[in-house]
Protein backbone atom coordinates (compact mmCIF):
# COMPACT_ATOMS: atom_id res chain seq x y z
CA UNK A 1 0.00 0.00 0.00
CA UNK A 2 1.23 3.47 -0.88
CA UNK A 3 1.58 5.65 2.20
CA UNK A 4 -0.02 8.66 0.46
CA UNK A 5 -3.19 6.64 -0.10
CA UNK A 6 -3.91 6.16 3.60
CA UNK A 7 -7.11 8.09 4.31
CA UNK A 8 -6.97 10.83 6.93
CA UNK A 9 -9.21 11.32 9.95
CA UNK A 10 -12.44 13.09 8.98
CA UNK A 11 -12.11 12.16 5.29
CA UNK A 12 -15.08 10.46 3.60
CA UNK A 13 -14.21 7.44 1.47
CA UNK A 14 -15.90 4.68 -0.51
CA UNK A 15 -15.47 1.05 0.46
CA UNK A 16 -15.35 -1.45 -2.42
CA UNK A 17 -15.67 -5.18 -1.91
CA UNK A 18 -14.58 -7.54 -4.69
CA UNK A 19 -14.81 -11.27 -5.30
CA UNK A 20 -11.74 -13.43 -5.92
CA UNK A 21 -12.35 -13.31 -9.69
CA UNK A 22 -11.96 -9.51 -9.68
CA UNK A 23 -15.64 -8.63 -10.05
CA UNK A 24 -17.10 -5.95 -7.83
CA UNK A 25 -19.26 -7.40 -5.03
CA UNK A 26 -20.57 -4.42 -3.07
CA UNK A 27 -19.85 -0.68 -2.65
CA UNK A 28 -20.55 1.50 0.40
CA UNK A 29 -20.81 5.07 -0.89
CA UNK A 30 -19.54 6.91 2.16
CA UNK A 31 -17.63 6.08 5.34
CA UNK A 32 -15.99 8.69 7.56
CA UNK A 33 -12.44 7.86 8.60
CA UNK A 34 -11.92 7.91 12.37
CA UNK A 35 -8.39 6.46 12.30
CA UNK A 36 -6.13 5.80 9.35
CA UNK A 37 -2.70 4.19 9.60
CA UNK A 38 -0.90 1.79 7.30
CA UNK A 39 -2.07 -1.10 9.52
CA UNK A 40 -5.53 -0.10 10.79
CA UNK A 41 -8.47 1.76 9.31
CA UNK A 42 -11.46 2.54 11.53
CA UNK A 43 -14.46 4.31 10.06
CA UNK A 44 -18.04 5.19 10.81
CA UNK A 45 -21.15 5.36 8.69
CA UNK A 46 -24.89 5.76 9.09
CA UNK A 47 -27.69 5.41 6.56
CA UNK A 48 -25.13 4.86 3.82
CA UNK A 49 -26.05 3.93 0.26
CA UNK A 50 -24.85 0.42 -0.64
CA UNK A 51 -24.75 -0.80 -4.25
CA UNK A 52 -24.75 -4.53 -4.96
CA UNK A 53 -22.98 -6.14 -7.93
CA UNK A 54 -26.29 -6.48 -9.80
CA UNK A 55 -27.02 -2.75 -9.44
CA UNK A 56 -29.57 -3.07 -6.62
CA UNK A 57 -29.18 -0.45 -3.90
CA UNK A 58 -30.16 -0.23 -0.27
CA UNK A 59 -29.38 2.03 2.67
CA UNK A 60 -27.85 0.85 5.94
CA UNK A 61 -30.34 1.05 8.82
CA UNK A 62 -28.15 2.07 11.72
CA UNK A 63 -24.87 3.70 12.70
CA UNK A 64 -21.88 1.39 12.36
CA UNK A 65 -18.17 1.38 13.10
CA UNK A 66 -16.00 -0.53 10.60
CA UNK A 67 -12.61 -2.06 11.39
CA UNK A 68 -9.98 -3.13 8.87
CA UNK A 69 -6.48 -4.45 9.59
CA UNK A 70 -3.62 -4.94 7.13
CA UNK A 71 -2.38 -8.16 8.77
CA UNK A 72 -5.66 -10.05 9.24
CA UNK A 73 -7.91 -11.66 6.68
CA UNK A 74 -11.16 -10.26 8.05
CA UNK A 75 -12.96 -7.00 8.66
CA UNK A 76 -15.59 -6.19 11.26
CA UNK A 77 -18.75 -4.08 11.13
CA UNK A 78 -20.11 -3.07 14.57
CA UNK A 79 -23.80 -2.14 14.17
CA UNK A 80 -25.62 -0.15 16.84
CA UNK A 81 -29.21 -1.39 17.10
CA UNK A 82 -31.89 -0.70 19.70
CA UNK A 83 -31.41 -4.10 21.34
CA UNK A 84 -27.61 -3.92 21.45
CA UNK A 85 -24.46 -4.16 19.36
CA UNK A 86 -24.31 -6.69 16.54
CA UNK A 87 -21.10 -7.52 14.71
CA UNK A 88 -20.87 -8.72 11.15
CA UNK A 89 -17.43 -10.09 10.37
CA UNK A 90 -16.36 -10.70 6.77
CA UNK A 91 -13.55 -13.14 6.03
CA UNK A 92 -11.63 -11.16 3.45
CA UNK A 93 -8.25 -10.16 2.17
CA UNK A 94 -6.41 -7.47 4.12
CA UNK A 95 -7.43 -4.00 2.91
CA UNK A 96 -5.73 -1.84 0.30
CA UNK A 97 -6.36 1.86 -0.31
CA UNK A 98 -5.98 4.09 -3.32
CA UNK A 99 -7.46 7.46 -4.31
CA UNK A 100 -10.67 5.73 -5.38
CA UNK A 101 -11.55 3.69 -2.27
CA UNK A 102 -10.63 1.27 0.48
CA UNK A 103 -10.72 -2.16 -1.20
CA UNK A 104 -10.75 -5.80 -0.19
CA UNK A 105 -11.68 -9.24 -1.53
CA UNK A 106 -14.70 -10.84 0.14
CA UNK A 107 -14.22 -14.56 0.70
CA UNK A 108 -17.85 -15.47 1.49
CA UNK A 109 -17.44 -16.77 5.05
CA UNK A 110 -18.96 -14.51 7.69
CA UNK A 111 -19.38 -14.57 11.44
CA UNK A 112 -22.39 -12.85 12.99
CA UNK A 113 -22.05 -11.91 16.67
CA UNK A 114 -25.13 -11.13 18.75
CA UNK A 115 -25.41 -8.69 21.70
CA UNK A 116 -25.29 -11.64 24.14
CA UNK A 117 -21.86 -12.68 22.75
CA UNK A 118 -23.08 -15.78 20.91
CA UNK A 119 -21.87 -16.10 17.34
CA UNK A 120 -22.41 -18.19 14.23
CA UNK A 121 -20.22 -18.97 11.22
CA UNK A 122 -22.30 -18.27 8.09
CA UNK A 123 -22.20 -19.01 4.37
CA UNK A 124 -20.00 -22.13 4.44
CA UNK A 125 -21.95 -23.52 1.44
CA UNK A 126 -21.36 -20.33 -0.55
CA UNK A 127 -17.66 -20.46 0.36
CA UNK A 128 -17.33 -24.07 -0.88
CA UNK A 129 -19.21 -23.22 -4.08
CA UNK A 130 -17.11 -20.13 -4.85
CA UNK A 131 -13.88 -21.89 -3.86
CA UNK A 132 -14.59 -24.41 -6.65
CA UNK A 133 -15.98 -21.89 -9.18
CA UNK A 134 -13.22 -19.31 -8.75
CA UNK A 135 -10.41 -21.76 -7.95
CA UNK A 136 -9.33 -20.33 -4.61
CA UNK A 137 -5.74 -21.50 -4.06
CA UNK A 138 -5.21 -24.03 -1.26
CA UNK A 139 -3.01 -21.47 0.55
CA UNK A 140 -5.93 -18.99 0.65
CA UNK A 141 -8.18 -21.68 2.15
CA UNK A 142 -5.61 -22.36 4.89
CA UNK A 143 -5.19 -18.63 5.61
CA UNK A 144 -8.95 -18.09 5.79
CA UNK A 145 -9.52 -21.09 8.09
CA UNK A 146 -6.74 -19.81 10.37
CA UNK A 147 -8.34 -16.36 10.42
CA UNK A 148 -11.73 -17.85 11.33
CA UNK A 149 -9.98 -19.28 14.40
CA UNK A 150 -8.31 -15.94 15.20
CA UNK A 151 -11.59 -14.10 14.81
CA UNK A 152 -13.40 -16.56 17.10
CA UNK A 153 -10.66 -16.08 19.72
CA UNK A 154 -11.01 -12.29 19.48
CA UNK A 155 -14.79 -12.60 19.93
CA UNK A 156 -14.48 -14.91 22.94
CA UNK A 157 -11.70 -12.82 24.54
CA UNK A 158 -13.42 -9.51 23.70
CA UNK A 159 -10.29 -8.35 21.89
CA UNK A 160 -9.85 -5.65 19.24
CA UNK A 161 -13.20 -4.35 17.92
CA UNK A 162 -15.04 -6.67 20.34
CA UNK A 163 -13.63 -4.91 23.43
CA UNK A 164 -16.24 -2.76 25.22
CA UNK A 165 -13.85 0.22 25.29
CA UNK A 166 -13.36 0.00 21.52
CA UNK A 167 -17.06 0.55 20.93
CA UNK A 168 -17.33 3.37 23.45
CA UNK A 169 -14.30 5.29 22.13
CA UNK A 170 -15.02 4.98 18.41
CA UNK A 171 -18.78 5.56 18.65
CA UNK A 172 -18.07 8.78 20.57
CA UNK A 173 -15.37 9.84 18.08
CA UNK A 174 -17.75 9.23 15.16
CA UNK A 175 -20.48 11.24 16.85
CA UNK A 176 -18.09 14.18 17.40
CA UNK A 177 -16.81 14.18 13.81
CA UNK A 178 -20.31 13.76 12.37
CA UNK A 179 -21.87 16.48 14.53
CA UNK A 180 -18.97 18.90 14.00
UniProtKB/Swiss-Prot annotation:
Cofactor(s) the record lists: Mg(2+)
Disulfide bonds: none
Entry annotated with the keyword Magnesium: yes
Keywords attached to this entry: Hydrolase, Magnesium, Metal-binding
Annotated residues for binding of Mg(2+) 1: 90, 106, 110
Catalyzed reactions: a ribonucleoside 5'-triphosphate + H2O = a ribonucleoside 5'-diphosphate + phosphate + H(+); a ribonucleoside 5'-diphosphate + H2O = a ribonucleoside 5'-phosphate + phosphate + H(+)
EC number per UniProt: 3.6.1.15, 3.6.1.6
Active site, renumbered: 26 (proton donor)
UniProt xrefs under Pfam families: DUF402
Domain of life: Bacteria
One MF annotation (Gene Ontology) recorded for this entry: ribonucleoside triphosphate phosphatase activity
Enzyme's top EC category: hydrolase
InterPro entries according to UniProt: DUF402, FomD-like_sf, Ntdp-like, SA1684
Claim: Iron is one of the keywords in the record: no
Binding, Mg(2+) 2: 108, 110, 123, 126
Record's function text: Has nucleoside phosphatase activity towards nucleoside triphosphates and nucleoside diphosphates.
Family: Belongs to the Ntdp family.
Protein name, as recorded: Nucleoside triphosphate/diphosphate phosphatase
Taxonomic source organism: Staphylococcus epidermidis (strain ATCC 35984 / DSM 28319 / BCRC 17069 / CCUG 31568 / BM 3577 / RP62A)
